[in-house]
């Protein structure tokens, strides 16, 4: 053994040595590898051969040759079969048929939080120099947009003054413009209760003596606190500034100028308020304008001033021979204008003093700065006056008229303005000429009939179309000629001096023919015009541009006006149209004279010299070509322009107050703008609440200035004296039970035009021949406070508003004259109200007040939108309301002196009127009856709260998010259409939506704005600073004129127009392509960067009327800022690969853009894409998606609420079919129980045909006894498992989500975990429909995020209240619930169960059966639902329907066809009955056809 072991060891050692030697070389290494591979292959081949040839055959032989015997009894066999069946059933039941439970989780979308800007000034204003500048700039915002030169001119002589605490400051003596820069100033007004009560016995509103700080006594005179002026607010009122600008403006012009209406105003004011002699004397001195030297000179027409009229302080340096409003040539040497006050002027605000509460710094812009501004920048002076007049109309007059009930005062202003704006036609047009004019209209009246005469008959003017057609080309030609002759100076001294004409000539009847009389009356104006070269006339007057190339007939008409050599032409040799032209021309001259546009007084003050002004001279040198755009109405000059557009906007483009105008030449050249119109007696020329179509001049007949008698029901607020007619209107009573507190009712003229036509009107004033109608409203572009009705057959001259606006823009004297008249005609009360009212301009996101703060003012929205939010206890905020134009906020808190209930912030840039509490207290003490109007507003608001059923469930968490959606959809004034990304056809979308809005009929109409429309309006100011002001004013005017303004963002994402669309929007429609990428687009990023807090709505455009399940959720998942819902809209479109309006480049489009355009064009002809037909197309226009969206924006949506009732709810299908056949659109659907099932089907398909088949299939499943029996389980929570029920609903809806439904849908459930109602608007449809149908006991509650949901009918079986809270106007509510058995019970104090059982089966018993335990539980569950049903029936705008389905049981789904037919027949009969009675609330969707009563659209007379 040892020897063998040794041998093996020796052999192994040898082998190791050999291996070591082999491994030391590469050859040995590779040899070992090869040998190993060969050995492995050999082993594998051997194993395979052995397995196939020996092992497998041996195993098969053994298996087949073996015998197996299995012995099993019947019990074991049955157990095996049951086990296999159970396994298969479990797989089918819980793995195959239970797919609905394995859907990916899609929880309900949470209501997005409201976007709020961070409060940048939580602790008040910050000190320092920057604060000083900010407060100063905010104070002078009242002047509008101030350009740099004007700002410097105003501020270079500004003074500051320190007031210590308690120091008084007499504003009556201060002639400049005062503002508070730092501190607090109280403004007091002299109390009319002087001597009525001893000191300390004041008539206080409160009982706690809080008015002690609101009164101030100086000697025996008591003062009442009017307002408090904080940092950045002006101490002077609007009329303080206007009085400075209009010191030298005459109230009336010409020979018919009478005395100032001092006595009338004084008598009216004294009798109105019982004012003492103190006020009368001050008003007398205020209105007594002839004490001013310049006005004395202007009205006297004499060569010199009276010596006694000169102010001694002026040292006799005022030139006696040069009136400030003269067109005479300037003298060679003119004295320098003194810097001191030129004359003592009584303050516009008497009886007013200021007292500093703390140490205060005030800034004063002296009156001399404003006088200097008039001379240097006359055009901008008129702009400031226009801004002030506009704000006075919108702030003071509108508030006094509609909010305080001061109707008499406002209408007295209208009457006084009518008395001052009169001018008689020349006598030569009063006799035979007027008779011939009437004959022309009489022939036309006989031809067309009396019925069409109410529209008005306009005299035909053949040259109107030719003039308008050639205007643009003539302007270009004149501009080119002006550039060619550019060396001619543009100052007025280039022409010979104009001779002043005799004012009395026009009213003197001279011998001779007609033209002699005309020439004698116009000997001055046309002579100077004829002496000018043609080019001068082209650059001075628009009409001369137009008459250079007109027909010879028109030239022949204008020739007699130039020289006397044509005076011998007889009238009978002229054509009749020349006489019509004379009428038009004379009417225009009278209009010009009445509004202050005369040759002897065309401005506030004549400048020293147009050539000597260093600013004008330097400006003329800067201009290239030397051509100044002095056409009459400031038309856009297509060729001439200034180097500096901003300077051009200030110093040129208009005839300043000191530059002369020839009204005769202007009237001759503009005569084609005038229409001579006949109105029969009773015709309405101007309606209250609408914008004046133009200016009416009464040629013959009488016009009544009226108010609707229906507006007088509120009575006289301030108790006018017995000898004075009551003129108060009270439009608040017309606002209905809804109580929307609009002090500027935009619907007034449109919605109630037919009603007002039939109402009895109360006469306010009479306009006689020579008077003007629509004077104030036309010039100020504000809505009319009055009706103008033809008292007799009347012949009027009509100047359209567009033409009048050009005159006002060109000649500032028109505005200044009206401002002068207003400042001298206003009652004292209106002046004090104007002083206390504060105009605020709030930036987007700025907080007006916080919750819990003291209520110190009422806010009225002039323009913009506000949102009131309330903090949640668990964090975040809830929206309590949104307030648009004309609505007021905070009356209840101010009257009750309670803290603010929430935080108010601006959604966008907003203009507000701040009505301070101190003013309200002052008015209440001086005139206690003035509080009646505000009390009515608060009472109507409280009535709305009581009547609104949603307030009863307002504290429940389910409805907090939607309680105030009604306020978000009501009173929308601006809507922006913003694409998600480039390539979305927003222009086509906007055009279709605009068409739908027109057909739906928005109040006051709607308009659409695009970049091109804005550029056309801005003209040459589109790219300078003045354009910003013009744009903001233009947009504000559009919001007042139209009920809805739509902004279409049709430019690139970074363009200013896109930014404007976002900042101006109350609601932003984000339009995207449903089939496109749901990623956030560049426009959305830009919108988010601007931090807009406007309500945002997503609109998805579909090629087909179908939305894939889950598509909408993919869009909404990343857009938490969508807080206004979403809409699905079908619109055929072609995707654009280039921007909508690509920016034009100087070098032309890039190569890439050209290729894209060519590809798009080629693809239109080469694409072979098969377009599938839409799933469903609406067969009626009222069902169109754009109409549905339009109704939603206008607050005219139609809602359908379907109640629960089991199988009885199948009648909903028939009623929906009847509504479709009756032409009633359905925009929003809500349902409970079976109503949620039928409503969800209709909301998904928006058609009755699909819901019929799907509902019948579901009813068949519910009627199957076997399915019900197989679903039974141990009744621990319910009798069934709910699987069959779930399966039936899931097979109907599949994976569809509520967001994918074509119509807006919601359903309600009862959350028994939190004991409240839940509203579901997102998530899987089948889950929440099933939860809404879960009858307790029959089905188990549905678990949703830890809460158990049951049938929503337990709390509210007819969700009308929630539908109303969504902002729906008309609601059709269908109730199919079972009727409660209210038979009186008398079974005693105890009840035997055995007796009850016997009595139930005893046919001879007359005792009613007592309710069972199940019936008692069911009635207990539906207690709250019964109360909600009664409130729903009383909801305004709700149409309650209950078909006769009481005979059908809750589970009788097998009678499907019968129940549907019952609902269909009932629906047809019910709707037909409403239509026959005229009570069908849905208005036909046709364009509004209104009777044309104005002059531009009547039937013209054939002459």
Curated annotation (Swiss-Prot):
Region annotation (Disordered) ranges: 252-348, 454-561, 722-745
Comp. bias (Polar residues): 262-272, 285-302, 487-496, 506-542, 552-561, 723-737
Compartment(s): Endoplasmic reticulum membrane
Chain location of the short sequence motif GXSXG per the record: 1231-1235
Keyword Chaperone on entry: no
Residues reported to bind a nucleoside 3',5'-cyclic phosphate 1: 658-777
Inhibition and activation profile: Inhibited by organophosphorus esters.
Protein residues bound to a nucleoside 3',5'-cyclic phosphate 2: 821-941
GO biological process: phosphatidylcholine catabolic process; regulation of phospholipid biosynthetic process
The keyword Repeat appears for this protein: yes
Annotated protein name in UniProt: Lysophospholipase NTE1
Species for this entry: Pyricularia oryzae (strain 70-15 / ATCC MYA-4617 / FGSC 8958) (Rice blast fungus)
